[in-house]
């Protein structure tokens, strides 16, 4: 992959570079994904998650930019794995962009075949929000992480993480949310990363409090704050596959244990034991097969240590990076003895159509986001947990790139909020249109048997019709851009998922599209969980009037 040293930053204000606000939104969000404040390796078009890219290569990036600048408001741009391949006449209520990233026929859906295609320039890895142009930096996963640790606290620690120690690893674009999510819940956390730059970035953005290269110092500080029942986050430089076994050897057992290293990609994401970053890069280039094998062996040691901590009483869970599957394939037959975070903590929210709803101020003015914060505090005042989140986010979350906010809203709530935002754009309360989107990790848009759809009640973990239906209904209902991806979060062969974005530009046409899309999108989450037999989803569907023909 050619590296290009250029600083990309989304335009701000109300002057259009394109022929309409929806096209402008797509252009600005593509560029925002590659803003140095947002992207992990913008010079390689990598946004987050190992090699999750916004475009296939620099030539394709420029062609997408040029296409969006000339795209008419009754045309649709098609993007195949980060490359613009067609512009067709459609209609004004159709999506302006349709994206399909990293999709492979199941028999060939593995990293080896993907890498062959990538080497030939035929495919890119889109992760979830990298290739769908709606990544907003670490805040994008922060509330979900906050909710996960909050639910763990409710289930196991009387509602708070005060006086507890969490041990985790991985401080990249996704995992970087963990330190702040734990301290927001009152806890102490040691977060390990092998890359000093990742820790420095989290400290710079106020997601992590301190840095150390010493395990002794990390443990001393952690124990001091744990005894005081005060929160602190400690970024520890090191390899988790070395540090966790060492803690087991010393008989040190944290209260919670999880992991968000880039284990989904053994070649580009995980660093084997005993290698510096430079040595790992050299081996990756010279002998990728050996590199992958060493990575898998290290992951197995990593999971063995997590299991040992679980046996000693630690609340242990997989945070969706497929590390258990790798260890299992390497012969660790009890790798799945600790659960994934969705069945352990998040699924009840999915049953209510809740998920990581986000919005971005195209103006670039933080005041536009602060005004929308006030809408949440006013319109959803009865949801104290949500309002607490908004207040904490305002105080503690630093914007990356265009100002944005995330919060988990459910069926009915998303459409209500979207209507209000569109009205605020229409009457000038907000200085420019707002982009509304979400992660692919949502209630009705993903099939991922080792993550979002793990341990479904009816055994339908691997049924991938649901994300396809989600993308289809969002497209016909007028989402601004819609994406269908493969392999996000957990790697090739293990997930299919869909994304959508809708632009609130203040027009009456946008109001109608918003109503349709922000109803059907979370509605798919309710439907999917009703179909799987979840009572809470059935209650939600009946209460909200979701029309499900065979619901009993």
From Swiss-Prot:
Active-site residues per Swiss-Prot or TrEMBL entry: 407
Binding site for NAD(+): 49-50, 127, 173-175, 193, 239-240, 260-264, 270-271, 319, 489
Highest taxon in the source lineage: Bacteria
Keyword Cytoplasm set for record: yes
BP GO terms, sorted: L-histidine catabolic process; L-histidine catabolic process to glutamate and formamide; L-histidine catabolic process to glutamate and formate
InterPro entries according to UniProt: Urocanase, Urocanase-like, Urocanase_C, Urocanase_central_sf, Urocanase_CS, Urocanase_N, Urocanase_Rossmann-like, Urocanase_sf
Catalytic reaction equation(s): 4-imidazolone-5-propanoate = trans-urocanate + H2O
Entry's localization field: Cytoplasm
Pathway(s) this gene product operates in, as recorded in its UniProt entry: Amino-acid degradation; L-histidine degradation into L-glutamate; N-formimidoyl-L-glutamate from L-histidine: step 2/3
EC number: 4.2.1.49
Catalytic class of the enzyme: lyase
GO CC, one annotated term: cytoplasm
Main function: Catalyzes the conversion of urocanate to 4-imidazolone-5-propionate.
PANTHER family: UROCANATE HYDRATASE
Family label: Belongs to the urocanase family.
Protein name stated in the entry: Urocanate hydratase
């Amino acid at each position: 992959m050619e590296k290009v040293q250029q600083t990309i930053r989304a335009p701000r204000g109300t002057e259009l570079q394109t022929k309409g606000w929806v096209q402008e939104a797509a252009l600005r969000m593509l560029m925002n994904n590659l803003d140095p404040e947002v992207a992990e390796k913008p010079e390689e078009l990598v946004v987050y998650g190992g090699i999750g890219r916004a475009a296939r290569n620099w030539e394709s990036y420029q062609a997408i930019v040029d296409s969006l600048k000339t795209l008419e408001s009754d045309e649709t741009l098609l993007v195949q794995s980060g490359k613009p391949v067609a512009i067709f006449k459609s209609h004004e209520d159709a999506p302006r962009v349709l994206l399909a990233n990293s999709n492979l026929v199941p028999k060939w859906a593995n990293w080896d075949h993907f890498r062959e295609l990538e080497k030939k320039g035929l495919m890119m890895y889109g992760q979830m929000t990298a290739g769908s142009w709606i990544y907003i930096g670490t805040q994008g996963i922060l509330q979900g992480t906050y909710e996960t640790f909050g639910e763990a606290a409710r289930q196991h620690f009387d509602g708070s993480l005060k006086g507890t120690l969490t041990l985790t690893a991985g401080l990249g674009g996704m995992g970087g949310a963990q330190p702040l999510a734990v301290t927001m819940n009152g806890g102490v956390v040691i977060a390990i990363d092998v890359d000093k730059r990742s820790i420095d970035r989290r400290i710079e953005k106020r997601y992590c409090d301190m840095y150390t290269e010493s395990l002794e110092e990390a443990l001393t500080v952690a124990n001091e704050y744990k005894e005081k029942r005060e929160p602190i986050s400690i970024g520890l430089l090191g390899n988790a596959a070395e540090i966790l076994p060492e803690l087991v050897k010393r008989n040190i057992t944290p209260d919670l244990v999880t992991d968000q290293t880039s284990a989904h990609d053994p070649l580009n994401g995980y660093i084997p034991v005993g290698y510096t970053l430079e040595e790992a890069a050299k081996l990756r280039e010279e002998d990728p097969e050996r590199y992958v094998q060493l990575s898998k062996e290290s992951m197995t040691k990593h999971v063995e240590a997590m299991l040992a901590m679980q046996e000693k009483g630690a609340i242990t869970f997989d945070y969706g990076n497929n590390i258990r599957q790798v260890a299992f394939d390497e012969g660790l037959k009890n790798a799945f003895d600790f659960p994934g975070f969705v069945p352990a903590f998040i699924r009840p929210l999915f049953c209510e159509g809740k998920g990581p709803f986000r919005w971005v101020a195209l103006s670039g003015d933080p005041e536009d986001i602060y005004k929308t914060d006030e809408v949440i505090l006013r319109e959803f005042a009865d949801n104290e947990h949500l309002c607490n989140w908004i207040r904490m986010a305002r105080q503690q979350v630093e914007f990356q790139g265009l100002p944005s906010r995330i919060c988990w809203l459910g069926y009915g709530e998303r459409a209500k909020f979207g209507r209000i935002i569109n009205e605020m754009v229409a009457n000038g309360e907000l200085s420019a249109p707002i982009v509304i989107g979400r992660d692919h990790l949502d209630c009705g848009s993903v099939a991922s048997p080792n993550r979002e759809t793990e341990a479904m009640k009816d055994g339908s973990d691997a049924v991938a019709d649901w994300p396809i239906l989600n993308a289809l209904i969002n497209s016909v209902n007028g989402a601004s851009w819609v994406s269908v991806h493969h392999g996000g979060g957990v790697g090739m062969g293990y997930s299919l998922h869909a994304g959508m974005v809708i632009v609130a530009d203040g027009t009456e046409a946008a109001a109608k599209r918003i109503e349709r899309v922000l109803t059907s999108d979370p509605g798919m989450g309710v439907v999917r969980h009703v179909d799987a037999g979840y009572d809470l989803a059935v209650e939600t569907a009946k209460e909200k009037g979701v029309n499900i023909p065979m619901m009993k």
